[in-house]
From Swiss-Prot:
Chain's gene name: yjaG
Native source organism of the sequence: Escherichia coli (strain K12)
Protein's name according to its UniProt entry: Uncharacterized protein YjaG
Similarity comment text for this entry: To H.influenzae HI_0431.
Gene Ontology CC terms, in alphabetical order: cytosol
Length: 196
């Protein structure tokens, strides 16, 4: 869908920066999943929270050991199917799950760049799809590029990227700060507020 120069720039970052970037974007998609679970009684919003917290832990705690295979197994059962629900919220919830799955797979494979690009694209797709749904029509990539909500999402992704790119080495305080700021904001990439 939407390409952005950020996808090329991500190549310059190290693995821990990719993982932090993905964790930040998942943190911004978490309210979409948590709200969906709350509204429908489906799944368990806490499983997403727990897995994401474990990812943050691996970034900030030296030698943190996590069995991501078993986490992924548990998580796969908590992913909704669009066919089972007749409400729009299922789509942003699925996108949030796709993003977290990409992040967990990056921890299993050790390959982080391609997963970081996918998480970036997934988050922007959530925003673009909502904008098109609200407008009641498809939009061209050109139109979407100029859409304020899409522009805002790219701006936030660039801001996270820039903060990480400025680091010479893993900065635990920056990682903790990003996590705290995003959790405190409690607002998703499409404006869903979910206080935890």
């Amino acid at each position: 869908m939407l390409q952005n120069p950020i996808h090329l720039r991500l190549e310059r970052l190290e693995s821990w920066q990719h993982v932090t970037f993905m964790a930040c974007l998942c943190e911004r998609m978490y309210p979409n999943y948590a709200m969906f679970c709350q509204q429908t009684g489906f799944g368990d919003g806490q499983i997403y929270r727990r897995i994401l917290d474990l990812i943050w832990e691996t970034l900030t705690v030296k030698d943190a050991k996590v069995n991501f295979d078993s986490q992924l197994e548990k998580f796969e059962e908590a992913i909704p199917s669009a066919d089972d629900f007749d409400l729009y919220g299922v789509y942003p919830a699925i996108d949030a799950c796709v993003a977290l799955s990409e992040l967990v797979h990056s921890r299993l494979s050790g390959e982080t760049l391609e997963h970081a690009v996918e998480v970036s694209k997934t988050s922007i797709t959530t925003v673009a799809m909502l904008e098109m749904t609200q407008a009641g029509r498809e939009m061209s990539d050109e139109e979407l590029k100029e859409n304020p909500a899409v522009e805002q999402e790219w701006d936030i992704q660039w801001e996270i990227f820039r903060l990480l790119a400025e680091c010479e080495e893993r900065d635990i305080e920056l990682i903790k700060g990003l996590r705290a700021d995003l959790r405190e904001a409690g607002e998703s990439n499409i404006g869903i507020i979910f206080q935890q």
